Amino acid sequence: MLPANFEDDASYDECTDDLNRVCADLANAAEDTGIALATISDNNIFFETKREYAKEMVTGFIRLNGMTVGAVANRSKVYDAEGNAESYEQVLTVDGCKKAADFINFCDAFSIPVLSLTNVTGFEATLEAEKDMARAVAKLTYAFANASVPKVNVIVGKAVSYTHLRAHETLAN
């Protein structure tokens, strides 16, 4: 699924999956986007990275029509094998931003396109997070803006925008 080095192009393999298949349970996977990523990928294979770190942000690799794609998504629930759910707020966290930024930089270094699924209502609002949030969000923003690979974002729920931050009023002054 991954290239051996940055010059290798092992990111494409023949697609054996039906591209016109119906993803019946996709609507139910908005909370745990790891399930959504597995559902949309070729042969339902999702290779998750850093599974135990910043669980509210999922990163990993999927194949779409045979091409390796890096996937980044935030999630509000994580389901285990027995169907038990661990819940998270729909916010960006410091660790989640760092995890996503590092993953995007990795994908860019190996020329792997990035797909992101977004369902976030804001930023973590704790005293501890307040110290590092601006730096972490800036790192994530820079990683997305600086990456030279194709990037596609799909909003699967809510998303924070300039309107939410009231930037339109600040920038107008």
Spans of features found by a protein language model:
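Amphipathic alpha-helical segments at domain termini/boundaries
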Residues: 1-63, 69, 73
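A glycine-rich phosphate-binding loop feature that marks nucleotide/adenosyl-phosphate handling sites
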Residues: 5-17, 55, 117-124, 156-162
